[in-house]
Regions:
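Non-catalytic C-terminal accessory region of glycerolipid acyltransferases
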Residues: 2, 98-274
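Alpha-helical membrane-targeting segments
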Residues: 1-20, 70-85, 163-169
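A generic local structural motif
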Residues: 9, 21-26, 46-47, 74, ...
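Secondary-structure boundary/capping positions in well-ordered alpha/beta enzyme cores
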Residues: 21, 56-57, 87, 111, ...
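Catalytic core of membrane glycerolipid acyltransferases/transacylases, capturing the structured
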Residues: 16, 29-94
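Short, basic, glycine/proline-bearing loop/turn elements
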Residues: 10-12, 83-91, 118-122
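Short gly/ser/thr-rich secondary-structure transition/capping motifs
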Residues: 16-23, 96-98, 155
Length: 274
């Protein structure tokens, strides 16, 4: 009830008036049934603007720190996330992260829309970073489509560290649903999970126009903060870009570059395979 009232009566109309969001591809969201909405992550405000424009309720996996804040701001943030039915995502790995994904699975099993940020954290510099395989595990185990969505300009509205937002227009592009049902009997195969995740990231790169960086955003943040990076944090192998070239399934690749560069590489790989 609180979610509906805030979205339709109070917060939603005000945000639409101030930020005038433009949207493409909204019809790619199914009218009913479960699906994963996989988004790039530029700003805290992504979790506000994107559900605002989707007609159906979207339950997001949000970092657990949002639910444990202290002080007035921290408590208000925690209250907001709870009242809007968001789920805490423990990003420490292991059993804690697995439990968070189980909660996300429950949303899908009940026919809901689950929002997830494959990068696992906000981009530190507006580029698109390597996706974590949790999104693939959920999609394969639940047998649901993945709808990629590119958030545009939210990093300019509320950059990391900025308390008050800048008033400017933002946008979002919803891509066509990605169907991975052919891999459902291989849901626990790590190589398949990596391959599926890479395809999702490729679509996000294509839709957003962001430069892709083949490294985890969390690792880059640690480095920028001057903290030591554990080798295991960046050791996960990337699926081969040419592995499924004949079927058009392409990894973002093992290097960084523009979406145009990646598409050229994709075309070349497909031609070689033929």
């Amino acid at each position: 009830m609180f979610y509906w009232v805030m979205k339709r009566i109070f917060l939603g109309p005000v945000l639409k008036l101030l930020f005038r969001p433009w949207v493409k591809g909204l019809d790619n969201i199914p009218a009913d049934g479960p699906a994963i909405i996989a988004s790039n992550h530029l700003s805290f405000s992504d979790s506000i603007f994107m559900p605002l424009m989707v007609r159906r309720p979207v339950v997001f996996l949000a970092k657990s720190e949002y639910f444990t804040g202290t002080g007035i701001k921290g408590r208000l943030t925690a209250l907001f996330f709870r009242l809007t039915n968001q789920l805490p995502m423990d990003r420490s790995g292991g059993a804690a992260s697995a439990a968070s994904l189980t909660a996300g699975m429950e949303v899908l099993l009940h026919g809901g829309l689950l929002g997830i940020y494959p990068e696992g954290t906000r981009s530190p510099d507006s580029r698109l970073y390597r996706g974590k395989v949790g999104v693939a595990r959920l999609a394969l185990q639940a047998g649901v489509p993945v709808i990629p969505v590119a958030m545009i300009g939210t990093d300019k509205v509320q950059p990391i560290g900025k308390r008050l937002p800048n008033i400017r227009r933002i946008g979002m592009i919803f891509g066509e649903p990605l169907d991975f049902s052919r891999y459902r009997d291989q849901a626990e195969d790590r190589d398949i999970q990596r391959k599926v995740t890479d395809q999702i990231m490729f679509e996000l790169m294509r839709l957003s126009g962001q430069e892709y960086v083949d490294e985890y955003a969390a690792v880059v943040k640690l480095r920028l903060a001057g903290k030591a990076v554990e080798p295991a944090a960046a050791a996960e192998p990337l699926a081969s870009p040419a592995a499924d070239a004949g079927r058009g399934e392409t990894s973002p690749g093992a290097s960084q570059g523009t979406p145009q560069d990646m598409r050229k590489a994709d075309d070349g790989g497909a031609a070689a395979a033929g």
